[in-house]
Structure formats: C-alpha cells, structure tokens
Regions:
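Acidic/glycine-rich phosphate/pyrophosphate-binding loops and surrounding catalytic core
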Residues: 1-190, 194, 200, 206
C-alpha cells in the first residue's frame, strides 16, 4: 500500500515525542452508531495504533458517549484520526437521519432507500451500513424481484410492454416506476407486483393511491 505524504509528515512532526497516548472518539450529538465494521486499523496505510470499539452497531447514543478508543504513539494517533472518523461519521450520520425518518413513519408503512446504488462505489457499503443500523431496507422489497425504471419503460416502449418483459425474466414480481394514475392502472392490469410513483410529488402518490 502506498504511504500518503500525510503519513510521512505526521511521523516527522511527532518524531520528538515518545510514549503512548490514548484518544477517545465521542459522539458530538445524539444519534445512532453505524460503520463500526469499517473502523479497522488494517485499512490504514501505516501503523495506526490499537483500536477498540466502545459502542455497538445500531446503538442509540447521546452527545459525549465514547465510541472508539485509540492507543498508540503520537504519529499513530495522527494516522488513526483520518481512518476512524470518516467511516464512523458518515455511516452514523446516515443511520441517525434514517432512524428519524423511521420514527416519523406512520404505522404500517415501511421505508426503503435505493439511492445508494447511484453513489460512488467506495461509499455504498457505508451507506448500506447506516441504513441497516437504523432498520431501513436498501431495496423496495425483500427477496427476488425485477426492477424496471422509467428509463427502461421508455426503452421498452410502454409500461405494459416493460412489465411483460419483466415477467418474462421470471425472477420474482415486477416493480415498475410510473408517473401518473394512467400508467399505474396500466401497470396493475399488466401484472406488476410493485408500483412505484417516482415523481417526488405527494399529490401524484395520493392520486395513484
């Protein structure tokens, strides 16, 4: 693994310090812990001390709660800072906001987040970890299904033709994106198992419902 220049600078900066130090990462606000599986010293590009989780994945915490302990020399703590805070902060931020959505969700309604698929590849596992910690689904439904986006509907010619193509795949129910009541009715008649109103308009959702 290539050593970043920041590591070399940290080692030179702290060259005059000896002995071990202890650092503790604490929550700065109330939230939900996520991403601990990615807080791994072996992922750092240089020696980063000894790390120990002080909280559990999915644990609700208050501001000031200790999350991770790092013990090492000054240079190791300097390296650890960049590789502990990032994954923990990103995933926990997602988990905290996702948990707020879940708590505000009416009874009988579930929340799924499929937007993680469009994130840069390195961020996808952290977002999924945040969703899992909050108890949100990363997919529309559990199990196998065929997802047909608006773009796929356009390419296949119509909602009805798209659903027929999806059913022919024979990989579970067909989930299709629609824009209005007319398309939703076509989808239902054509055999769609899941109808997704994808306009970001609550009025459109209410009309289809």
């Amino acid at each position: 693994m290539t050593r970043p220049e920041a590591v070399n600078i940290a080692e030179r900066l702290f060259a005059g310090l000896s002995g071990e130090f202890r650092a503790v990462v604490e929550a700065t606000q109330d939230g939900v812990v996520a991403g601990l599986g990615f807080v791994d010293p072996s992922l750092a590009p240089a020696e980063a001390g000894r790390w120990r989780a002080l909280a559990e994945e999915g644990q609700p915490v208050t501001a000031g709660t200790p999350l991770v302990e790092v013990i090492g020399n000054a240079a190791e703590l300097g390296v650890a800072e960049d590789y502990v805070l990032g994954p923990l902060g990103f995933a926990s931020g997602i988990a905290t906001r996702a948990y707020q959505f879940k708590e505000a969700c009416p009874p009988g309604l579930s929340i799924a987040c499929g937007g993680w698929k469009k994130l840069p590849a390195p961020l996808k596992p952290l977002l999924r970890a945040g969703l899992a910690a909050a108890g949100l689904l990363p997919r529309l439904v559990a199990g196998d299904f065929v997802y047909i986006s608006k773009n796929a509907v356009t390419l296949l010619g119509s909602v009805e033709q798209a659903i027929r193509a999806g059913l022919a795949v024979d990989h579970g129910p067909v989930a299709v994106q629609v824009k209005n009541v007319e398309e939703a009715l076509f989808a239902a008649r054509a055999g769609a198992g899941v109808i997704m109103v994808d306009t970001a308009s609550l009025d459109d959702l209410a009309a289809v419902h």
